Regions:
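Extracellularly exposed regions in secreted/surface proteins, prominently low-complexity, repeat-rich
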Residues: 108-174
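Ampipathic, surface-exposed secondary-structure segments
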Residues: 12-20, 88-122, 172
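Extracytoplasmic low-complexity, Pro/Thr/Ser/Ala/Gly-rich segments
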Residues: 1-67, 169
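Mid-length scaffold segments of soluble, non-membrane domains
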Residues: 59-98, 104
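Stable alpha-helical elements in mature extracytoplasmic
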Residues: 50, 54, 62, 92-99, ...
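Second-shell loop/turn segments in exported
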Residues: 40-44, 80-84, 150-151
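Soluble non-cytosolic domains of exported or imported proteins
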Residues: 48-49, 90-91, 155
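Solvent-exposed, flexible loop/coil residues
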Residues: 27, 43, 75, 82, ...
């Protein structure tokens, strides 16, 4: 009889889990109207130093490494980069949203995220509590439109950022 391997401690999952478990191919969500939404993985970036992966004001003391992936909604209207900061000790922050300092967007060629960059991110979310991870998102439009101060953020775009950050944080820390 083969016994199942024990689940790795939460603080080691970033290293022990396969990338497909940290960043699954699809993440389910719900639109503001209650319709089902699916976020589809556009690509996974290589591990990066925290200073490269996060905007300076988003950096947290004790950040060891950053993991990033970009998702698009199934209509290929919205795109969001999810960044996971692996920390030396639990983060005592809380949920924050808006156009705050966050993860640096990652574009992937020949797909819905090919025109996504720092000028294209409209909104983001930072999630974390009492674990060695902080999860941040930066969300924008797949058409590459740049953010202009005063631009209105659609509820669906805001939900994209929130749902991806929350779902991936919960999966990693459950």
């Amino acid at each position: 009889m083969i016994w199942p391997l024990p689940e790795p401690p939460v603080s080691e999952r970033w290293r022990a889990w396969p990338v497909s478990q940290i960043f699954p191919e699809t993440v389910p969500g719900v639109s503001p109207s209650g319709a089902r939404v699916t976020y589809v993985l556009a690509g996974v970036a290589p591990e990066a130093p925290c200073r490269t992966a996060f905007q300076l004001a988003a950096l947290r003391r004790g950040c060891r490494v950053a993991l990033r992936a970009t998702y698009a909604d199934s209509t290929q209207t919205f795109v969001a980069t999810v960044g996971i900061a692996v920390l030396d000790s639990p983060w005592s922050g809380s949920y924050r949203a808006g156009r705050l300092a966050t993860v640096r967007p990652v574009a992937f060629p020949r797909g819905p995220a090919e025109r996504f960059g720092e000028r294209q991110y409209f909104t983001g979310v930072v999630v974390g509590s009492h674990e060695n991870y902080m999860v941040a998102t930066a969300a924008g439009y797949t058409d590459g439109r740049p953010y202009q101060p005063g631009d209105r953020v659609l509820p669906r775009l805001r939900d994209t950022a929130r749902q991806l950050a929350t779902a991936l944080y919960r999966a990693l820390t459950r």
